[in-house]
Amino acid sequence: MKVWSDRRIIDNKAPLDSFSYPLHYGGPAVWEGMRAYVQEDGSCKIFRLKEHVQRLRDSSKIIGYNIPYSNAEIEQACEALVQQNGNKDLYLRPIAYLNVDAESIHGIQTKDLKLDIYCVPIPKLHRNSEKGIRMVVSNVIRAYPQFTMQAKTPANYADITQVQPLLDQTGVQDAFLLDNQGYVVEATVANFFVVKGDVIMTPPNKGSILPGITRRTVAEVLGDSALMFSKYKKVPRVVEKDITKADLYTADCVFLCGTYAEVVKVSEIDGRAIDGDDSYFRIIQTEYSNVVRGRK
């Protein structure tokens, strides 16, 4: 593991005091997940680096704190980490956090966040198999305005601890979460798409979902009518729509998407098999790989 911390790259985890403010109170902190891919020419490139760094910056603004590095400095630090790790597929996790102790809760004087960036080789994910993963719809609510999901902050993901007992009980790999109206908005750490015929639906960005960079990339590929028609003779219609449980149960195909998991098919939801036409999922798997590997 390589870590960029205080303008230097170290070989171990950055030191974290167990009496730190973020550990006790869930913030202030913001983070990002990025992937670097080996390209066709043998180089290694971070996918959508500028977009990820800007989202990190935006997250810090939303929670009212400052990252004391420019976007260019953060991008350079990420690229230096990739060079240190050699040409292999990598996962990067920048995290900016308030570096004060828990007793400072009523007397914080600084608005500046400390920044560490972790970089590790990424393993092949078993859940990326063609078989797909099993999921349930949980009763856990992740909704605006209780959660400001436009900010990628640890506090917004604390509800994973509420979901985990359900996953352990049912033996499934992930769960969908709801908004205040009972619509399905996200998986625990991923956006999702629902395919029905040539219509591909995804929840609207109304505050209850993270505006995913992978989600946007998938939508761009599916919306490239020239590519879809010339290569696959299929032209889908991608729409943002409030998603119900019935939309999930009657779908031809459902798939998750996110930086770490990439694109993952869902094979079962609440004990109901999702086993219709999965051709759009297979197209996205192929074309997403082409995009991140520099083949497109």
Task: Show where each model-derived region lies.
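Helix-start/capping segments and mature chain N-termini
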Residues: 1-69, 73-80, 103-296
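Short secondary-structure junctions
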Residues: 83-90, 227-229
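Short, internal active-site loops enriched in acidic
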Residues: 97-102
